[in-house]
């Protein structure tokens, strides 16, 4: 019954807020454009769905301008609405499984190349640093400034 009491409290609070807003002619800026519709799943759980009213034409225009679903990412062929679109990494559309597979292989090769280059840089720095010079070139720490003799 706890879940049901929460739903009832929310409904009563929303009604009270609406009555207060109408009586005071003060609008709560947070409640404008938000529709709250609680749904009881069972006695212990509640789902509150909120829908914020927005200008859908701006959203449509944004997606239409992006154009990532208009052309294949690899071969730049036009993607047709009646054909399947193959996605990779969430924002790359491909016209076929082959194009998507080629891109995956190219990305894998690029990551391996970067990893290899970074390993070579580390090895190069390791051999170039004076701290790792062969022992015959190192000075005895007792002969350095600040050292002491026995």
Curated annotation (Swiss-Prot):
Intracellular or extracellular location(s): Cytoplasm, P-body
Annotated Gene Ontology cellular component terms: P-body
PROSITE patterns, A to Z: ZF_FLZ (PS51795)
GO-annotated molecular function: zinc ion binding
Biased composition (Low complexity): 12-28
Zinc finger (FLZ-type): 67-111
Keyword line: Cytoplasm, Metal-binding, Zinc, Zinc-finger
Region described as Disordered: 12-31, 129-150
Role summary: May act as an adapter to facilitate the interaction of SnRK1 complex with effector proteins, conferring tissue- and stimulus-type specific differences in the SnRK1 regulation pathway.
Record-stated family: Belongs to the FLZ family.
Subunit structure: Interacts with KIN10 and KIN11 via its FLZ-type zinc finger domain. Interacts with KINB1 and KINB3 via its N-terminal part. Forms homodimer and heterodimer with FLZ1, FLZ2 and FLZ7 in vitro.
Protein name: FCS-Like Zinc finger 15
Organism: Arabidopsis thaliana
Gene: FLZ15
